[in-house]
Amino acid sequence: MTLTRLRACATAGAALAALTLGSGQALAATPHAPHPRPYTVVDLGTLGGTISSGIALDAATVVGSSTLPGNTDFHAFAYDRATRTMTDLGTLGGTSSSTVAVQGRYVIGDSTTADGDEHAFVHDLRTHRMTDLGTFGGTGSHVNAISGDTVVGSARTTGNQGEHAFAYDVRTGLMTDLGSLAGPSGVSSAAGISQGRFITGTSDVSTAPDTTQHAFLYDLRTHRMTDLGANGGASSQATAISGNTVVGISRTGSAPAPDAVHGFAYDIRSRAWTDLGDHMIAHLQVSGHTAAGTDGHTAYTVDLSTGIRTPLGLGQGSTGVNGITGRVVVGETNPGPLAFAYRTDTRSSTLLPAPGGLYSTASSADEQGAVAGTAATTTDPDTVNSSYHAVLWTPRGH
């Protein structure tokens, strides 16, 4: 893990989305026409530099990263939506930090240490304390999600010989090695957690002659890791979890398309695997019974209870999906990028305004439909997008 990844995360909102093209059929499609819904936009500012990026939010807080004076380093920040103040969360002794998510009093992310390594952290907004989650004997760790009192991610093992998924309890400070489907020598990582109990991710599977990766489900109550398989294909990868549903991608590994990629949804209760086809192969997300993803050009949602697939209908360019919360899907459309918010209940799409310039990206939404992201803030004769700041979009009337 390197500082390069940290900085890429911090400036993701200001970069153009790189999308992999795909094609194919998946489920039934329902067309719709976009209907604009007004949003107000607030420039969240910076920590003294000229660049900031909004990554995630909840009802009280927006988190992201910002440059310091001189634009040499990025620090994680928390923006209080009530007081409209931005706080520098600092680092674990290194020069840079970035955020991944926020839930109530806890912000999770990654930071460099004094040794130049990268470690996962939890920052408590009440105590103003950043806790280093450490490793399993190696030099680095990375955090991906939080649910309830549990944080999940991956950490390097002794001698950096491997990397294992972990679960960290913010109450006890206990970090649990979830192992891998291939035993102690295998590699695994956790992508998400649901209900404070079910963790999903991807792990090596010991097969001859090669090592194959499969999606897994880990139950914190039974301490059991279950191989979700690949539905007859060659490999699978879990990307997200919500409620009792895991989503991800699988490779078919069969002729005539041995490397064909399909999206999937897995029901934890029934253990049923649903093939979402080759329209849902990138940035696959899930919230409740709705999955969202893209084929690399067009973004779609799928109602997992009916099987109906709906294109987001945002024009002729490519569309990327960055997140889904409740009934709101967010991402960006290109050329641009231009941030959008799409509501699954009304099937309406809205291009979100930038405070200045043109370009913007949307990273995540909260349950009320507010959106965090990054947007151009200045317009001048030489460049219409000379500065990018973290922003908060709020539906009017909320």
Task: Show where each model-derived region lies.
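Residue-level hotspots at or immediately adjacent to binding/recognition sites across diverse folds
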Residues: T2, L27-H398
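Secretory targeting and sorting signals
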Residues: M1-T30
